[in-house]
């Protein structure tokens, strides 16, 4: 009996201790990239290069993108997961494929749950097709089951995520219309209760899978101080460990502000959120303009690097800012995912690789940032 008990304990220790090792310690400054499009880009034949790595004839040769960015200083990777996208990209299996590659490179991992079959953002939070007719209670159970299914699949691969997002850019709620926030009615229809309930269910499922995982609730526009949002979340039972923000400071058309104004407001906002809500902040998405060729590209690259340098230095000065993730920096050369074509969407113009397929100055600035610890 004693031998059986010993074997069971030993087996338990093995199962909880066989995760991939990370190159940088938990809680240190995250210099990350969201690389969720990488597998689709590779399938389309896109290649990545590093001017410092050439063959014996002096010719550039293709590099593994994750390995190369790791060499430049990347220590974390963010990956989105959709419930059931028609193409299969960013579904569980695709996310697992990329997560395993990142883990093999010693990366810390963030999983970004959209709880949708396609992009979720402030203007779109579409219930997955398979969940369309669910009641609120059934949606809560679906959120729980989906979260556990994905996280236990990671655990089976020996991957222990450090962070998990319960929803993507959700200032207006999630799983619309059931969890859509209607600010005018001050929760008269229970919308805040339902949205906060979804975050709580996701939070508890994440903690069931990984007890010490950091759970993030993520909103857009780091330059906007939404203290009222976080107060309402608390009031209605929402749960989180860390606040996540997006920041695209060169998009004046969105904000009507200059990039120095947006960076300054973002710094003030991050400091105020940390002070008022006593939790750390993560910049889950950042992006700088990246387009053109020849002299046009060179001018854009220089300006983007100035903006990035300013923003990184501001965030480095804040003890409880835990890091910055660049959103899809690997995109270059006008590439766009297949589903964008029938939608009439253009390519993403805030990637951070040059027209020659090499990391830009702005990306190198982020990945070479020197803050070693982030105190929470």
Give the predicted meaning of each segment:
Residues 43, 49, 272, 293-310, ...:
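Aromatic-rich peripheral "rim/lid" segments of glycoside hydrolase catalytic domains that contact
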Residues 35-38, 82-84, 114-118, 166-171, ...:
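Active-site beta-loop-alpha junctions enriched in small/polar residues
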Residues 23-65:
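Boundary/entry segment of secreted carbohydrate-active catalytic domains
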Residues 30-35, 77-79, 109-113, 162-166, ...:
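Hydrophobic faces of well-ordered beta-strands that scaffold small-molecule active sites
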Residues 42, 47-49, 54-60, 83-93, ...:
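Acidic-and-aromatic substrate-binding clefts and catalytic sites of carbohydrate-active enzymes
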Residues 62-66, 212-214, 226-296, 312-316, ...:
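Glycoside hydrolase catalytic-domain groove-lining segments
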Residues 15-17:
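C-terminal motif of bacterial Sec signal peptides marking the signal peptidase cleavage site
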Residues 66-191, 195-214, 220:
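Substrate-binding cleft and catalytic face of glycoside hydrolase catalytic domains
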């Amino acid at each position: 009996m004693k031998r059986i008990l010993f074997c069971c304990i030993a087996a338990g220790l093995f199962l909880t201790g066989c995760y991939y090792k990370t190159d940088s310690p938990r809680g240190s400054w995250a210099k990350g990239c969201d690389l969720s499009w990488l597998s689709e880009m590779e399938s389309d034949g896109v290649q990545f290069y590093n001017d410092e790595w050439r063959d014996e004839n002096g010719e550039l040769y293709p590099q593994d993108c994750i390995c190369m960015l790791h060499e430049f200083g990347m220590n974390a990777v963010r990956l989105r997961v959709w419930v059931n996208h028609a193409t299969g990209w960013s579904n569980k299996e695709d996310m697992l494929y990329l997560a395993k590659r990142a883990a093999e490179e010693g990366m810390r991992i963030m999983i970004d749950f959209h709880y949708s079959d396609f992009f979720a953002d402030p203007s779109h939070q579409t219930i997955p097709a398979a969940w369309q007719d669910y009641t609120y209670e059934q949606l809560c159970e679906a959120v729980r089951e989906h979260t556990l299914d994905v996280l236990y699949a990671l655990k089976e691969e020996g991957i222990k995520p450090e962070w998990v997002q319960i929803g993507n850019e959700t200032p207006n709620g999630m799983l619309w219309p059931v969890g859509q926030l209607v600010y005018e009615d001050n929760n008269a229809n229970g919308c805040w209760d339902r949205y906060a309930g979804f975050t709580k269910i996701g939070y508890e499922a994440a903690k069931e899978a990984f007890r010490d995982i950091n759970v993030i609730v993520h909103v857009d526009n780091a330059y906007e101080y939404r203290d009222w949002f976080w107060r309402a979340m608390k009031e209605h039972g929402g749960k989180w460990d860390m606040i996540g923000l997006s920041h695209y400071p060169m998009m004046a058309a969105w904000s009507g502000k200059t990039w120095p104004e947006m960076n300054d407001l973002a710094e003030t906002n991050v400091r105020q959120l940390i002070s008022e809500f006593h939790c750390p902040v993560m910049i889950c998405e950042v992006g700088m303009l990246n387009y053109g060729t020849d002299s046009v590209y060179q001018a854009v690259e220089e300006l983007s690097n100035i903006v990035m340098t300013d923003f990184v230095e501001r965030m480095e000065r804040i003890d409880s800012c835990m890091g910055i993730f660049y959103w899809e920096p690997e995109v270059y050369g006008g590439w766009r995912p297949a589903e964008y074509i029938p939608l009439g969407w253009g390519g993403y113009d805030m990637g951070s690789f040059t027209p020659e397929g090499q990391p830009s100055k702005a990306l190198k600035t982020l990945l070479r940032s020197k803050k070693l610890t982030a105190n929470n």
